[in-house]
Amino acid sequence: MLEIREGSNHDLILTGRFDASQVEKARGVFLSLNEGKTLDFSGLDYISSAGLGVLLAAQKRLSQRGHKLRLVNVNNHIRDVFRFSGFDQIFEIA
């Protein structure tokens, strides 16, 4: 299960597993963003291709408005997923 909550500095903290069963929940959050956000992945254990698709759609929508998503505290496994998919070229990963 995926939990998305706002942190103390207005970043979004993701916890759990971001898979196909959580896409509708996440889509509602990410596609409602009107400005760039930092996504804290420190509690994220897994992301599927469906999760990547939601993030890509949000990034595309935000970039058309001059904003972007920034990812922080990305574990090695998820960092590899972004690298192998080429998403490390699309997202700023700190």
Locations of regions flagged by a protein language model:
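Amphipathic alpha-helical interaction surfaces in cytosolic regulatory modules
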Residues: 20-90
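Short acidic-hydrophobic, aromatic-tinged amphipathic segments that line or gate anion-handling sites
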Residues: 92-94
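Short beta-strand/loop segment at the start of cytosolic alpha/beta domains
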Residues: 1-13
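Glycine/Thr-rich beta-alpha phosphate-binding loop at enzyme active sites
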Residues: 15-19
